[in-house]
């Protein structure tokens, strides 16, 4: 049985990070000796799931998701689904990726929940493919999530809700990596 593909979104401009004092694009910012994006990709690789990096510079998140789904369908026409993961979640755990992927076996949409907060990746079954292909502009996949029955997975992974939008977010991630704030 084929596995869903993790789509790592890396097309955004990162304007809030620059506005907060960042001297580089947020995905290239250093965190514990590696870039933010490298940490995210390390977790994706460790999950064992197939993946695709979408860094094509599309005008909006919807365009990026649609382009990535289109690309993965060309290489895997019988795709079982997709996990949409922003590239700025450097603390995401590979176990969370696998849990969301497994939940797609019986559900159209699956998303992790950490302490009551919805996180990423959001998983979509193949039934959602056409809706994802039709996304455009700055709107992400929230409308698709609302159009299907979703399962919420309770996870012990602060990384699914720890994105890097500002320099302060980067500092918070650094503290979390070193256990100063705790994650459980």
State where each predicted segment sits.
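Nucleotide and nucleotide-moiety/phosphate-recognizing core
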Residues: 2-118, 149-157, 181
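Active-site-adjacent beta-strand anchor residues
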Residues: 54-55, 85-86, 122, 135, ...
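Flexible, gly/pro- and Lys/Arg-enriched active-site loops
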Residues: 99-145
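Short aromatic/basic micro-patch
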Residues: 30, 91, 123, 163-164
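Short, solvent-exposed polar/charged micro-motifs at secondary-structure junctions
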Residues: 62, 121, 161-165
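A general structural signal for well-ordered alpha-helical segments in protein cores
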Residues: 37, 62-65, 97, 129, ...
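Conserved alpha/beta core of the MobA/IspD/sugar-nucleotide pyrophosphorylase nucleotidyltransferase superfamily
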Residues: 2-6, 134-184
